[in-house]
């Protein structure tokens, strides 16, 4: 029987994986520049970690969680997003204490799991890269996180980006706005989708995020949260906008934008790309915001946080659509050609010596003729070939050839075994 991968998953094969490695390496380097350090959390957590943080009415909790009971009757869930697990680790390991530098800045990357309809750039097992910063409610930290996201996408070769920002205000703001939304939508209750009917009194802000077209038409004329901001919330958002202006980062204020998770407050943002690879119009690639109550929700003290997450599958699709050049970080330096049965052990030793000197090397393992081996070296774009036949074996030498110039020299095997990099640097004029 031939087995296939589960629906909503993908095999990332060599060739494609180079792009993923480039994304991850670029992210790691940039995160280090911003002084974010890596954190790794389990791929499954107690179910309540996600149900308490994502919100009981969110699509993630109500429709998309991969949750199960283990043999100890513990209710567990595969992680549907990265933030909740990071916050749980922050609280459990008491990283909120005074001995830990604040803001406490970390990043993560890895697979997440949601049961949703697979489509372009959206899988049931998908990969997310994200950052979180705890311990400061400064609007400038919001902007640092936004700038980091914009910088990352730019370094990965994406253009035609649009940054949308909004504020969900503080608790007083949302309480007043929540009631205003209910008052506005209640007369249209029978026209709402079934999901929005459930959400109207539990979390009416989520109706604004409905994918139902009729819901979208109804909320088009809804009150704006910007009209309900407290002076404190207004001051925070004004500083965010002023900081973005100071950095020369273009943005639009989208007063209708809410995030798909219930834990956000104050600043929220989405970075979108305009590419046919993900359908018509702008599509969100990276999104995040501030979540000042999340640490408390998971048993910690009052501690503000801000972060973002991006979907790697969507990002890779965009990079491919924009034909972003991926550097070859592992070119083949030397292909070793062995001629004759007697040279097999010597070829093995030579390849190992070249690798130990810090260069990349390969050889034939299929008993191919010399001509076929040289063709392989050409196809693999080897910088050099190193050929050893029975005569060279008897003379304790090998022939080193530059594939770029055709220049060829004879090299003692002892020199190759001792330091092949030095051989290339001192005895070979064609680099």
From Swiss-Prot:
Homodimer. GO terms for biological process: histidyl-tRNA aminoacylation. PANTHER family: HISTIDINE--TRNA LIGASE, MITOCHONDRIAL-RELATED, HISTIDYL-TRNA SYNTHETASE. This is Histidine--tRNA ligase. It catalyses: tRNA(His) + L-histidine + ATP = L-histidyl-tRNA(His) + AMP + diphosphate + H(+). Its main location: cytoplasm. Keywords: Aminoacyl-tRNA synthetase, ATP-binding, Cytoplasm, Ligase, Nucleotide-binding, Protein biosynthesis. InterPro entries: aa-tRNA-synth_II, aa-tRNA-synth_II/BPL/LPL, Anticodon-bd, Anticodon-bd_dom_sf, His-tRNA-ligase, HisRS-like_core, HisRS/HisZ, HisRS_anticodon. Belongs to the class-II aminoacyl-tRNA synthetase family. It is an enzyme of class 6 (ligase). Coiled coil: none annotated. Its EC number is 6.1.1.21. It comes from Levilactobacillus brevis (strain ATCC 367 / BCRC 12310 / CIP 105137 / JCM 1170 / LMG 11437 / NCIMB 947 / NCTC 947). It is found in: Cytoplasm. GO terms for cellular component: cytoplasm. One of its GO terms (molecular function) is ATP binding.
């Amino acid at each position: 029987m031939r087995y296939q991968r589960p629906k909503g998953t993908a095999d990332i094969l060599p060739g494609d994986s180079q792009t993923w490695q480039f994304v991850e390496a670029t992210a790691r380097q940039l995160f280090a520049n911003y002084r974010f350090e890596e954190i790794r959390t389990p791929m499954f957590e107690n179910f309540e970690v996600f149900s308490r943080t994502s919100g009981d009415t969110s699509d993630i909790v109500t429709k998309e969680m991969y949750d199960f009971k283990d043999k100890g009757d513990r209710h567990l869930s595969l992680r549907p997003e990265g933030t909740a697990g990071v916050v749980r680790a922050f609280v459990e390991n008491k990283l909120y204490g005074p001995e830990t530098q604040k803001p406490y800045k970390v990043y993560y990357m890895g697979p997440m799991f949601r049961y949703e309809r697979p489509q372009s750039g959206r899988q049931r097992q998908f990969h997310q890269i994200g950052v979180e910063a705890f311990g400061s409610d400064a609007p400038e930290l919001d902007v640092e996180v936004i700038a980091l996201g914009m910088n990352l996408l730019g370094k990965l070769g994406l253009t035609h980006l649009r940054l949308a920002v909004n504020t969900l205000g503080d608790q007083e703001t949302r309480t007043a706005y929540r009631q205003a939304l209910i008052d506005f939508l209640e007369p249209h209750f029978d026209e709402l989708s079934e999901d929005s009917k459930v959400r109207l009194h539990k979390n009416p802000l989520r109706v604004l995020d409905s994918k139902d077209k009729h819901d979208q038409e109804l909320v088009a004329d809804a009150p704006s949260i910007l009209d309900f901001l407290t002076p404190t919330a207004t001051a925070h958002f004004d500083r965010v906008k002023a900081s973005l202006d100071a950095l020369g980062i273009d943005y639009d204020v989208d007063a209708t934008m809410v995030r798909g998770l219930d834990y956000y407050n104050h600043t929220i943002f989405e970075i979108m790309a305009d590419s046919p690879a993900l359908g018509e119009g702008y599509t969100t690639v990276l999104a995040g915001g501030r979540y000042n109550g999340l640490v408390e929700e998971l048993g910690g003290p009052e501690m503000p946080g801000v972060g973002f997450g991006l979907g790697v599958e969507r990002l890779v699709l965009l990079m491919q659509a924009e034909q972003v050049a991926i550097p070859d970080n592992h070119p083949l330096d030397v292909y070793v050609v062995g001629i004759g049965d007697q040279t097999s052990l010597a070829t093995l030793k030579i390849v190992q010596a070249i690798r130990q000197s810090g260069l990349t090397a390969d050889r034939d393992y299929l008993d191919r003729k010399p001509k076929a081996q040289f063709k392989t070296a050409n196809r693999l774009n080897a910088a050099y070939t190193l050929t050893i036949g029975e005569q060279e074996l008897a003379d304790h030498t090998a022939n080193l050839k530059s594939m770029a110039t055709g220049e060829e020299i004879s090299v003692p095997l002892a020199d190759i075994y001792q330091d092949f990099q030095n051989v290339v640097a001192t005895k070979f004029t064609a680099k």
